[in-house]
Structures are given as structure tokens and as C-alpha cells.
Amino acid sequence: MALRLLKLAPASASARVVAAGAQRVRGIHSSVQCKLRYGMWRFLLGDKASKRLTERSRVITVDGNICTGKGKLAKEIAEKLGFKHFPEAGIHYPDSITGDGKPLAADYNGNCSLEKFYDDPRSNDGNTYRLQSWLYSSRLLQYSDALEHLLTTGQGVVLERSIFSDFVFLDAMYNQGFIRKQCVDHYNEVKSVTICDYLPPHLVIYIDVPVPEVQRRIQKKGDPHEMKITSAYLQDIENAYKKTFLPEMSEKCEVLQYSAREAQDSKKVVEDIEYLKFDKGPWLKQDNHTLYHLRLLVQDKFEVLNYTSIPVFLPEVTIGAHQTDRVLHQFRELPGRKYSPGYNTEVGDKWIWLK
């Protein structure tokens, strides 16, 4: 049900967000203000990716365990390279790109809670897997937004984690006994039919911080919920990164690894990026036609999320038809959610009959 609400995000949502932060950086034309959606006629009339993509049109993801400084490094890299920074997608990412941008209630956001997961990861109400499933969908939506921005403007993007690294949490949850094998199977099936449509990042930056140091940082941060995270869970996340994620990504893209101390020097990291040749991975095989189809996909948020809902009964993520109908109608009664943006009088939209 929650995914149905997520799909209600208008196709232009990401474009509106991107446009709000668009700017000219180092000669990159980053305006995405457009009246019509991209389609076949615009492609035939010459609107092709090769005209705007340059050597600085890159997708970079910054990965690492919890509290490793990913956000700080990602933001600094983006500023120094003139890229757009996408903060890590959380539970409320769909809210941030639709409506008034304010977080909505849990009923409209996967009916899950990160705080509850930290407090009771073995909760028998299915919160743990609902959380992981919802976060994957949020990251999928954000990755499509990042690619849409790249293909529309030519400006590079920097993300904190992505759909390609999301599984490290699933592995840790399963190894710790937080979720059932059926949940893992469901996740892998959803992932297999969604991630295949997307190109991996050009570069993955991994910040390697030992688990004891991660725990020290969590304690210093002082979040009462995060402080309950066990060292075993953190170690499983690290193992998934080092044993599975990094070896797999090293075959698809460039990979840079830094210690906690090295990651603090963003200037040195940017210098390392400048020296990379970017001479491997599927991006090298793309042409105007393949990028045209990719752009059509990522601008259509309904299609992006379509296969995250598969017809499999799993108690953790399944609710009844009556509850679905009730929540959907409640969602439609929220200010600005009944009609497309610009057509809701209750939030001040005017001259609707002229649009």
C-alpha cells in the first residue's frame, strides 16, 4: 500500500526539485526548466545526451558504515567539483520531493520506523523488513532523480549510498536474525527486476572506519536509538561491504577507499578523482539511443517504482484491501494531494481553469 502512495508522486517532482537548486557551475548549463516532458519528438529534433554530457558528467556515490562521515565528504566533493549533492535518501525522501516537502505520517511512508528498528530490531510486527524494503524504494527513486538530473543538465551528481549498496543492511539484518529468509528472497526478487534497468555509478568512494571507532562516534553523537546498535550488526555491514559490494563494484566502475583520517581531506580526494581514467564500466558502451531510453525511464516515477510491488504474499509488507482503500482516501484528503501540483485550491493554487 505504501508503495502505491509513493507512486503517486508526479513525474515532474524530481525536475521541480532539481530546478529549485539549479545553477551554473564551471560552465555547465544546469537549468532543467522545461514545459514538456522529454520524449521521441524532442529526441528527433536534436535533444540528445551527447550534446550536454562531458567528462564531468559523472555519478559518484560515497559509501561506508554508519557514522563514517559520508555526508560531509559527499557535500564537500560536490562543492569542489561543481556537482549536485544528493543527501542520503531516508524514509521521508518521497515527501521531500512532493507536496510541500514536509514529512508525512508513518501510514504514508511504509508504516515503518528507523527508531523502532534500533530499539527492537526483532519486533514481530515486521517493522524491520518493511523499513528495509521502503528504504530500497526510496533509494531507487532518488537514484532515478540523480540520473534524470545528469541526463537533463549534464551536471555530475554525488550521492550518499545507492541502490547498489543497499543490500549490505539486508545481509546484516538476516545474519543477526532480524528478518526471515522469505524476506531476503522477496528483496532479491524486487532488486533483480528493478536494478537491471540502471547504470552503476562511475565511481564509488568507500570510507573504511573500524567498528570500534564507529561505535565511539555513535556514542559521541548521543542519539539514544542509535546507541543501541550492536557491534555484531555493524561488523556484518562492514563484511558485506568488503566481501561483496566492493569486489562487485570494482568490476563495474572505479573504486577509491579511504581511512577515516584520509576521508577528512576532501581536497586530496578530489585530486585522486581528477587522476582517474574512468576507462571501464557500462557507461562506456552507451550512445544517444540507450541514454534516450534511460531518460524516458527515470523521468517516469510510476515506471521507476512499478516493479517494487510484486504479487507475492509476505506478511511483513502485505495489508488488506479495505485498509489500502482507507489509507489511500486519507492520503488524497491531505492538502495539495488530491490533484496534480498547481490544481489544488486548498493550498492556494489559482487560475486553475486557465491551465
Curated annotation (Swiss-Prot):
The keyword Phosphoprotein appears for this protein: yes
Record flagged with keyword Translocase: no
Residues modified to N6-succinyllysine: 285
Quaternary data: Complex I is composed of 45 different subunits. This a component of the hydrophobic protein fraction.
Disulfide partners: none
Post-translational changes noted in the entry: Phosphorylation at Ser-250 by PINK1 is required for the binding and/or reduction of the complex I substrate ubiquinone.
Family: Belongs to the complex I NDUFA10 subunit family.
InterPro entries: Deoxyribonucleoside_kinase, DNK_dom, NDUFA10, P-loop_NTPase
Gene symbol of the encoding locus: NDUFA10
Name listed for the protein in its UniProt record: NADH dehydrogenase [ubiquinone] 1 alpha subcomplex subunit 10, mitochondrial
Transit peptide: 1-35
CDD domains: NDUO42
Assigned keywords, A-Z: Electron transport, FAD, Flavoprotein, Mitochondrion, Phosphoprotein, Respiratory chain, Transit peptide, Transport
GO biological process: mitochondrial electron transport, NADH to ubiquinone
Localization terms from the record: Mitochondrion matrix
Cofactor field: FAD
Function: Accessory subunit of the mitochondrial membrane respiratory chain NADH dehydrogenase (Complex I), that is believed not to be involved in catalysis. Complex I functions in the transfer of electrons from NADH to the respiratory chain. The immediate electron acceptor for the enzyme is believed to be ubiquinone.
Cofactor binding annotation: Binds 1 FAD per subunit.
Organism: Pongo abelii
Any single Gene Ontology cellular-component annotation: mitochondrial matrix
Residues where Phosphoserine is found: 250
